[in-house]
Amino acid sequence: MTQQDFRTKVGNTVFGVRATALILQNRKLLVTKDKGKYYTIGGAIQVNESTEDAVVREVKEELGVKAQAGQLAFVVENRFEQDGVSYHNIEFHYLVDLLEDAPLTMQEDEKRQLCEWIDIAKLEGINLVPAFLKIALPDWDGQLRHIHLEE
């Protein structure tokens, strides 16, 4: 049975709920690069799926490895425009532990993308999406933060 993503479109605005993995090792963040931008691993949660289960599923789908959801670090209300479409996402950013070695490529639908480890002190120098992570992640104090973004 195909699962339905927790996403809907009204007019020119897409509303969705996402879960993303903040995979950190030795103060480096695992990201993937596409079209000059860097992204964390993650995606839409499915209807009736917890955000913790969603982030573990997304890591398995995209990286092909088992993972365990850790602490929820950020809840983000993210509004932005991309390719002429408005988006309003509620995002759950979890610290995630990989239970297997991280690959250096990921699978996004039919496309393979390279992954790389970026030192969190150097995030400011890359085009990271969402951009708030450049400052919020290196300065994170272990407490859940609620962030409002309009990019």
Model-inferred region functions:
Residues 5, 139-151:
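Acidic/histidine-enriched, glycine/proline-rich intrinsically disordered or flexible terminal extensions
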Residues 106-139:
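NUDIX/MutT-family hydrolases
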Residues 11-15, 84-90, 107-112:
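A generic structural micro-feature
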Residues 80-104:
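Active-site-adjacent beta-strand/loop module that shapes the phosphate/pyrophosphate-binding cleft
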Residues 1-20:
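Acidic, metal-coordinating catalytic segment for phosphate/diphosphate chemistry
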Residues 25-61:
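Conserved Nudix-box catalytic region and its N-terminal flanking loop in Nudix hydrolases
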